[in-house]
């Protein structure tokens, strides 16, 4: 059985991208995202995760690509969406301790290989 999840790459009008830091797991910066519920479409899951993790409501989601990968030895399918967000993120303080925009050339060092792969997919879709 392949687990499915969503990743949302949100940029602001200045072209900066939104990253979040979790209160659990390996410390570092990630794109907002999470699992897809049993009766949920990937797009609905993306909207829900953005709202839960950043407080931002998104209207215009674009599917950038689908990555089939292995996470912790198990098959995983990730639906990667992009959107533009105008509002300042407000992390919930429980699951997400920090959410902020970064300029592309000033991204934090502490980003996982999975996060970087998603960034590359997005960058190749934009150019």
Give residue ranges: language-model regions.
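Unchanged
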Residues: 36-59, 65-123
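Conserved Nudix-box catalytic region and its N-terminal flanking loop in Nudix hydrolases
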Residues: 12-52
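A periodicity- and composition-biased signal for non-globular, repetitive helical segments
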Residues: 27, 123-124
């Amino acid at each position: 059985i392949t687990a499915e999840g969503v990743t949302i790459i949100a940029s602001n009008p200045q072209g900066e991208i939104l990253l979040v830091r979790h209160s659990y797991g390996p410390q570092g910066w990630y794109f907002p995202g999470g699992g897809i519920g049993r009766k949920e479409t990937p797009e609905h899951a993306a909207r829900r995760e953005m709202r839960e993790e950043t407080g931002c409501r998104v209207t215009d989601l674009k599917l950038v690509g689908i990555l089939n990968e292995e996470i912790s030895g198990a098959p995983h399918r990730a639906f990667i969406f992009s959107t533009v967000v105008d509002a300042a993120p407000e992390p919930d303080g429980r699951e997400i301790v920090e959410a902020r925009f970064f300029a592309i050339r000033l991204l934090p060092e502490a980003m996982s290989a999975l996060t970087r792969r998603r960034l590359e997919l997005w960058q190749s879709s934009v150019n």
